[in-house]
């Protein structure tokens, strides 16, 4: 069983037990897509709150998610990503709820979303952006969840890892497309994945390169074709996350 297969099997169990919440009022913040379109001179940062991962194990179990997120916001991050998967990443929807209450910028619910129940729960907790991972979904499920998310007035970050998935993301009209440098089956990371796929960008979407960034030099590798990078582990291991986040700022 690959990492992704194991995660999805567990996620199906989780979602079966998850209540269907009533849709509550949406948290007010700016559109991340509009923010990226308006701020093109610098590579923007999605900074992540992540306690652990399947490949690295514990990264920072003692983190205070609110303080971490506030450090990211102070450093100029355009959005905070919060892992809400409890089993493999040791996150929780409560982490997201607390972060969303304490920052002004958009918050991304980072999880393996397979059900509308998760979309509503994320919105009610304060997320205004949700992640849909193409490799975790059939195309039929992807389109259904994409449309449900838009109906809930959520922005959708559609994640791809290869040319075929990129073509699907562009075909369905995704405005935020994330290229994950991590192979979710093996969890191996290679920034060259983003470099390769950039030649196939054809839509008016904003493009985000995800995973593997530790230095400004790493970020510079993708700065010509991408609007933002998503960084988690490198920031979570730093004693001074605000300074670490600032050090990743690159002019485009």
Curated annotation (Swiss-Prot):
SUPFAM superfamilies in alphabetical order: Ribulose-phoshate binding barrel (SSF51366)
Keywords: Amino-acid biosynthesis, Aromatic amino acid biosynthesis, Decarboxylase, Lyase, Tryptophan biosynthesis
PROSITE patterns in the record: IGPS (PS00614)
Assigned protein family: Belongs to the TrpC family.
Name of the top EC class for this enzyme: lyase
Its EC number(s): 4.1.1.48
Chemical reaction(s) catalysed: 1-(2-carboxyphenylamino)-1-deoxy-D-ribulose 5-phosphate + H(+) = (1S,2R)-1-C-(indol-3-yl)glycerol 3-phosphate + CO2 + H2O
PANTHER family registered for this protein in UniProt: INDOLE-3-GLYCEROL-PHOSPHATE SYNTHASE, TRYPTOPHAN BIOSYNTHESIS PROTEIN
Name used for this protein in its record: Indole-3-glycerol phosphate synthase
BP GO annotations: L-tryptophan biosynthetic process
Matching CDD domains: IGPS (cd00331)
Pathway(s): Amino-acid biosynthesis; L-tryptophan biosynthesis; L-tryptophan from chorismate: step 4/5
Gene: trpC
MF (Gene Ontology): indole-3-glycerol-phosphate synthase activity; phosphoribosylanthranilate isomerase activity
